[in-house]
């Protein structure tokens, strides 16, 4: 059964909106960041990673965001161009704002942390005037990142994009993507997260992220009840993630589908979520069954946590298919199916 319909006449498949950053991942593995001397530089930020992931899978991808007017901004735009992502609506900060920097600390295969520099960042300079109705209308779906709602004028730009998407039969995907930086209070988080969630066709987040979204409305911390609440506003699919325990997609007909992580040689404890999101959305667009969409997303996540980078390691559709095939041959057909 199809739970969501896309307008296939629209030329672009997805337009992610929000944060673009630079990731510095250590090549000195499994030591504190204070002792690391060598790092590799990658394009980062969840919406940017998802954009790259979708493009690698063969989707036609645009982007709405703001980057710094310097060499780091050039690096991002050039990288997007190389990946085939449309950059016509990636703007440049006008007052010296910097691109966000993320340094990762990989202490072990299980323990990782992230050090973010988010003061005076360019991505929060995205202005409502940068959101063009014709561009929004050209996409089958937009992907709004919760981080972009943390500060004005970026949050108003996202809300404008959401309203224009509603007006133009464009599906709205809300990737909650919580980062504690910049938010002033849990009430502020709940106000803006819930506003987008009430208008979304698909909501993707961890249990913690759904709890933050529901902070004011008072939904109990129960996955099924959470899904039913947001589906009462019109959401078709709610995907609630539980890390190592797997994830479940709740559909608006009362059904649910659960997937587990694929076995993987783990290198780091982060990066899987963006691969999961891009592969899940790609599979939905392809018309796959929900359980197959989850399986494709889970496989992509396992590929990502086995790699040093996020954006650079985003797999092609064939790489994900080969990974699933090899995993099932090794561990059995139901390796990731709960």
Task: Write out the residue ranges for each language-model feature.
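Glycine-rich phosphate/adenosyl-contacting loop at the front of the ribokinase-like
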Residues: 2-86, 265-267, 334-338
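Conserved phosphate-binding/catalytic region of the ribokinase-like
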Residues: 1-14, 163, 215-338
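Short, conserved phosphate/pyrophosphate- and ester-handling motifs at nucleotide-, phospho-/glycolipid
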Residues: 54, 206, 273
């Amino acid at each position: 059964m199809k739970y969501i319909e896309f307008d296939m006449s629209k030329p672009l498949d997805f337009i992610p909106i929000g944060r673009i950053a630079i990731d510095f991942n250590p090549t000195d593995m499994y030591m504190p960041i204070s002792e690391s001397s060598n790092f590799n530089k990658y394009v980062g930020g969840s919406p940017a990673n998802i954009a790259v992931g979708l493009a690698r899978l063969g989707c036609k991808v645009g982007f709405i965001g703001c980057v710094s007017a310097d060499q780091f901004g050039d690096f991002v735009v050039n990288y997007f161009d190389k990946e085939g992502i449309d950059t016509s609506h990636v703007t440049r900060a006008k007052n010296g704002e910097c691109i966000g920097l993320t340094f990762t600390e990989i202490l072990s295969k299980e323990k990782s942390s992230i050090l973010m520099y988010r003061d005076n960042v360019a991505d929060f300079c995205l202005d409502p005037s940068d959101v063009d109705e014709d561009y929004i209308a050209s996409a089958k779906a937009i992907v709004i990142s919760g981080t972009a709602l943390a500060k004005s004028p970026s949050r108003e730009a996202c809300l404008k994009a959401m309203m224009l998407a509603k007006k133009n039969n464009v599906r709205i995907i809300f990737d909650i993507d919580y980062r504690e930086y910049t938010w002033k209070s849990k009430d502020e988080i709940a106000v803006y997260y819930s506003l987008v969630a009430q208008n979304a066709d698909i909501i993707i987040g961890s249990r913690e992220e759904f709890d933050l979204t529901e902070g004011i409305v008072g939904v109990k911390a129960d996955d099924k009840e959470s899904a039913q609440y947001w589906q009462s506003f019109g959401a078709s699919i709610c995907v609630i993630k539980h890390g190592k325990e797997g994830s479940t997609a709740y559909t608006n007909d009362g059904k649910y589908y659960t997937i587990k992580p694929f076995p993987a040689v783990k290198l780091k404890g982060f990066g899987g979520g963006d691969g999961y999101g891009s592969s899940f959305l790609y599979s939905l667009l392809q018309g796959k069954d929900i359980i197959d969409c989850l399986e494709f997303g889970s496989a992509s996540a396992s590929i990502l946590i086995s790699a040093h980078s996020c954006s650079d390691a985003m797999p092609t559709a064939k790489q994900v298919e080969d990974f699933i095939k090899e995993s099932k041959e090794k561990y059995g057909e139901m390796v990731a199916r709960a």
